[in-house]
Curated annotation (Swiss-Prot):
Protein name: Small ribosomal subunit protein uS17
Name of encoding gene: rps17
Cited function: One of the primary rRNA binding proteins, it binds specifically to the 5'-end of 16S ribosomal RNA.
Keywords: Ribonucleoprotein, Ribosomal protein, RNA-binding, rRNA-binding
Keyword field contains Ribonucleoprotein: yes
UniProt organism field: Methanococcoides burtonii (strain DSM 6242 / NBRC 107633 / OCM 468 / ACE-M)
Length: 109
């Protein structure tokens, strides 16, 4: 049985025994929530999410494209793949570069 993490996100259908899973483990989530696309899933239980945005340049009244990459923990119950649109939530630092965990994955058609 999955626990409530405090967000309006449905519980995953699969079970896992990962201690760093916000639904089945001991990891609390707090802080920022981001949405992005998975660009790499080659690491063990880690995905790289690319987040794209547009920033207004006031002088020219035009937008420039910007992007950033965020490393996030990928629990086995969610198991996001490359190309999926995921929602990540901030948590305590899990490693040198990971401070986010995947809480929802939508399969891209």
């Amino acid at each position: 049985m999955a626990k409530d993490i405090g967000l309006d996100i449905p519980e995953p259908t699969k079970e896992c025994d990962d201690i760093n899973c916000p639904f089945h483990g001991e990891l609390p989530v707090r802080g920022q929530i981001h949405v992005g696309t998975v660009v790499s899933a080659k690491m063990d239980r880690t995905v790289v999410i690319q987040q794209r945005r547009e920033k207004l340049i006031n002088k020219y009244q035009r937008y420039e494209k910007r992007q950033s990459k965020i490393h996030a923990h990928n629990p086995p119950c969610i198991d996001a793949k490359v190309g999926d649109i995921v929602t990540i939530a901030e948590c305590r630092p899990l490693s040198k570069t990971k401070s986010y965990v995947v809480v929802k994955a939508e399969v891209k058609a």
